Amino acid sequence: MTLQEFYARVGGDYSATHSRRPSEALIKKFVLKYPGDPSFEQLRAALDAQDWELAFRASHTLKGVAQNLGMDRLYKAAAALCDAVRGPKPLEDASLWPPVLAAHEEVLAAVREL
């Protein structure tokens, strides 16, 4: 799979990412590191524990990682959840979690094919 195909699959913007980081090798290097980023698992654990401060921090970090890597679908899902727990305050809309989970799993599956 090419990086362009990867970005199409995960709902990302390869052109915008490439304009910020002109080296395709560098983009691929950082994309391949995504599975090792702890923010998603920290977010999952925080939501399970109803630790809203940690949920905010983890979702904010995940949002930033996704945005920096041009993974727009994951970024938008994480941003919506981040805004919901900002304060920090309890997550009142549980429907915000499944899009984050789905986008994360989609990225992981696509990374395995790079």
Residue ranges and their predicted role:
Residues 1-57, 61-114:
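Two-component system phosphorelay core
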